[in-house]
């Protein structure tokens, strides 16, 4: 790996994405890789997906000591609901995941993005709104809301009938409906994702958007309704226009 990174470094590449979906599944290996990545600071930023429920104290110590800009983290939390995670057969306890996520979001030397997945079994639309509120309170660097996709050969696709999930037979095989979220509600979740990208995930407006979310639990509902009714949710807007809309 060191040799490959040396080649990458020699070509002036500034960003490397590690494709391991659970970088810290093996804490010892994760620690060794972090020390290897450190050799290429400040020239390369490494993008990792990390499981917040599997953060050992030793790994936390390593993360605290890293220089700013070395890592860009994605915490694949998917949902903040225990029944949803259990039904989806996600590893780790929710309490551990939340504790780990709070820790990651508190680090000033790296940015942590949190992912939620609409269309997971048992996951309701109102719970998605509540989870966004919680993540905003954690000060997540970005909140990314995606729709579940049932790729051929995956366990979730094999269990689709059992779980009451209807999905498109065509790529990208997006979930269309579950027992807990309707077709229309999934469309609302997609519009909510656009809202997050346009406002919360935009650095210029993140602090204001976070403050509005945390000061009023109904803000996201009302703001999304306004953007939809005004036909703004699918329209590209300049930074200045977004500020005026807020």
Where are these regions (language model features)?
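Proline-aspartate-enriched helix->loop->beta-strand connector
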Residues: 13, 140-141
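Short secondary-structure boundary/capping segments
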Residues: 32-36, 89-93, 127-131, 157-165
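Short acidic (Asp/Glu) and glycine-rich catalytic loops that position anionic groups and cofactors
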Residues: 12-15, 42, 165-173, 204-207, ...
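Catalytic cores of alpha/beta
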Residues: 58-63, 121-139
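Non-cysteine beta-strand/loop elements that form the S-adenosyl-L-methionine
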Residues: 60-80, 141-150, 156, 166-168
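Radical SAM enzyme core and accessory elements
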Residues: 191-246
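Alpha-amylase-like alpha-glycosidases and glucanotransferases acting on alpha-linked glucans and related
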Residues: 98, 133, 161, 166-202
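Conserved SAM/AdoMet-binding glycine-rich loop
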Residues: 1-121
């Amino acid at each position: 790996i060191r040799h490959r990174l040396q080649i990458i470094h020699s070509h002036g590449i500034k960003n490397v994405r590690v494709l391991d979906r659970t970088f810290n599944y093996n804490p010892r290996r994760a620690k060794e890789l972090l020390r290897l990545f450190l050799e290429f600071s400040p020239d390369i930023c490494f993008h990792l997906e990390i499981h917040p429920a599997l953060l050992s104290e030793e790994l936390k110590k390593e993360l605290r000591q890293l220089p700013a800009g070395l890592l860009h983290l994605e915490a694949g939390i998917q949902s903040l609901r225990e029944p949803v995670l259990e039904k989806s057969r996600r590893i780790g306890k929710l309490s551990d995941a939340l504790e780990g996520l709070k820790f990651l979001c508190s680090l000033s030397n790296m940015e942590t993005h949190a992912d939620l997945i609409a269309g997971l079994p048992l996951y309701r639309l109102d719970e998605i709104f509540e989870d966004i509120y919680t993540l905003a309170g954690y000060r997540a660097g970005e909140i990314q809301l995606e729709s579940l996709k049932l790729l051929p050969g995956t366990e979730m696709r094999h269990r689709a009938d059992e779980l009451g999930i209807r999905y498109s037979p065509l790529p990208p095989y997006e979930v269309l409906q579950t027992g807990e979220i309707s077709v229309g509600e999934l469309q609302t979740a997609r519009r909510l994702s656009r809202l997050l990208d346009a406002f919360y995930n935009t650095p210029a407006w993140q602090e204001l958007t976070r403050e509005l979310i945390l000061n009023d639990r109904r803000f996201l509902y009302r703001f999304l309704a306004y953007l939809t009714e005004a036909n703004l949710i699918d329209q590209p807007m300049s930074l200045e226009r977004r500020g005026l809309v807020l």
